[in-house]
Swiss-Prot record:
Disruption phenotype: No visible phenotype under normal growth conditions. GO terms for cellular component: nucleus. This is DUF724 domain-containing protein 4. It is found in: Nucleus. Residues 63-189 form the DUF724 domain. The gene is DUF4. Expressed in roots, leaves, stems, flowers and siliques. InterPro entries: DUF724. It comes from Arabidopsis thaliana. Keywords: Growth regulation, Nucleus, Transport.
């Protein structure tokens, strides 16, 4: 390429393109033309841009849709629930949320998750089925955010199964009690008839 003063120039950058003159030593004479494009690298500051969250297995980096700045994250990570089952939530639902709302929402969800796990730890077979159903659906929601819900969800499902088994056992027990009561009633009536028949025979003598 020639400059306006007539002197021959080396590589010249124009609008993101690297233009090399045919006579320049770096000219690519492979038949692809006198110009070749060189992709420019652009580096973005991840702290200033919202990145789409990606989950991963242990050892892989997780990109969050916000920057952690709240002190509460250290409290969450030191909690017994996190120590028992390490958590790596990535909050995909917050990918397109404004950063100023994303982190507080994620912190709220994390605190709620810890509370739910501790609540389930204290549940028993007497817990109402309606309450167990609510927690079952809640943990499914947490799972969509990247939380490991295998343990608490298993506890909820186990309690639901135990409640069903106990309800079935009670139903069978009531059925047996009713059957025994019916048999006893029939036997009692039969004894009454036998006694009456015996008395009639004695009277006839």
């Amino acid at each position: 390429m020639f400059l306006t003063n007539g002197s021959r120039a080396g590589p010249v950058k124009e609008r993101g393109l690297l233009i090399i003159d045919a006579d320049h030593p770096n000219y690519d004479a492979s038949g692809r033309g006198k110009r070749r494009r060189v992709e420019q690298e652009h580096h973005s500051d991840l702290n200033n841009e919202t990145a789409a969250p990606t989950g991963g297995s242990a050892g892989e980096e997780i990109v969050l849709p916000f920057t952690k700045t709240l002190a509460s994250w250290k409290e969450f990570e030191s909690d017994e629930v996190y120590k028992r089952t390490p958590q790596r939530p990535h909050f995909p639902s917050l990918a397109y949320t404004h950063p100023s709302f994303g982190e507080p929402t994620a912190a709220y969800l994390t605190a709620a998750f810890i509370d739910c796990v501790k609540t389930v730890d204290g549940m028993c077979e007497d817990t109402p089925k309606s309450e167990l159903d609510v927690y079952r659906e809640t943990f499914k929601m947490f799972e969509e955010q990247g939380f490991d819900v295998a343990e608490p969800l298993s506890q909820v499902l186990t309690l639901l199964v135990l409640r069903k088994m106990r309800r079935e056992s009670l139903r069978q027990q009531k059925g047996m009690e009713k059957e025994m009561a019916d048999d006893y009633s029939k036997l009692k009536k039969s004894l009454v008839r036998c006694k009456s028949s015996f008395e009639d025979k004695e009277t006839a003598k």
